[in-house]
Amino acid sequence: MTILSDVKALGQQIWLDNLSRSLVQSGELAQMLKQGVCGVTSNPAIFQKAFAGDALYADEVAALKQQDLTPKQRYETMAVADVRAACGVCLAEHESTGGKTGFVSLEVSPELSKDAQGTVEEARRLYAAIGCKNAMIKVPATDAGIDALETLVSDGISVNLTLLFSRAQTLKAYAAYARGIAKRLAAGQSVAHIHVVASFFISRVDSALDTTLPDRLKGKIAIALAKAAYQDWEQYFTAPEFAALEAQGANRVQLLWASTGVKNPAYPDTLYVDSLIGAHTVNTVPDATLKAFIDHGTAKATLTEGADEAQAQLAEIAALGIDVETLAARLQEDGLKQFEEAFEKLLAPLV
């Protein structure tokens, strides 16, 4: 038993927020699964780093550049292969839990973030290209992305809805998921295999706010927001409306804590893992945070602790004139821009 097994017993999955060819081919990912990692997430920044720093791509890049393909098609050829390989490594985990764990995420192009139909078309194409039941397509949680979520769920595709900072936007996502499930059920189709995670970003909130807050609130607001979002989640998914869908096989959306590597060196390096452990959630962690948590983290159900204190902290920043929904919109736009820039850097060597 490892600390990751202890976390899993508390109802939370730990995923790895990283993917590269070396990680898969070296057996390192398989070893991480033996330790208790339950899935993998990727994004344009992760692939940009992998392509630049992993020598295993060099021959394929050279070969693909001899073919009549666009840079994006060359990228997708390699990314789809990596995700398919990672899905293979995670398949035993996926099957051992009846399809509830062992997912690997691949993100649609950041340029589609405001294009619902384009997102749907690309998500369908990528999902078909990967060809694995434990593939999850990652879609940004813009209004267009949430519209796409409804359609993709009704198609039977599992989705990782990413770049959530807003509780209100997260609730909109739950409603879109429920509509997609209802459509599929109305068509007489199975829903039990569909899983959606709502990726709620953590550390970027504190990074944005800490310079403006009194010391007593520094490093506290991201966790307070996450705890409040979890209360919202409990209310939504225990309500009679969703219970009716659940009775027909629907799974609950799971909150996934993302951006859980600590950015401020003054904070404990496992802060955003230790503080957010709770049932029906996922935490996707970068390699350094995973190693730190295995070394000196604490497996304890903390997510439901201090709920009143979290609400009080949120009320206090509201009294200071900070509107968390306005902040959330700005952070999402910043995140989209970062992924667009990473995507451009990723494609540049593939021209």
Curated annotation (Swiss-Prot):
Its main location: cytoplasm. Pathway: Carbohydrate degradation; pentose phosphate pathway; D-glyceraldehyde 3-phosphate and beta-D-fructose 6-phosphate from D-ribose 5-phosphate and D-xylulose 5-phosphate (non-oxidative stage): step 2/3. The active site is at K138 (schiff-base intermediate with substrate). It is found in: Cytoplasm. Its EC number is 2.2.1.2. It holds the Pfam family TAL_FSA. GO terms for cellular component: cytoplasm. Keywords: Cytoplasm, Pentose shunt, Schiff base, Transferase. Transmembrane segments: none annotated. It catalyses: D-sedoheptulose 7-phosphate + D-glyceraldehyde 3-phosphate = D-erythrose 4-phosphate + beta-D-fructose 6-phosphate. InterPro entries: Aldolase_TIM (IPR013785), TAL/FSA (IPR001585), Transaldolase_2 (IPR004732), Transaldolase_AS (IPR018225). The keyword Nucleus does not apply. SUPFAM superfamilies: Aldolase. PANTHER family: TRANSALDOLASE (PTHR10683:SF31). Belongs to the transaldolase family. Type 2 subfamily. This is Transaldolase. It comes from Neisseria meningitidis serogroup A / serotype 4A (strain DSM 15465 / Z2491).
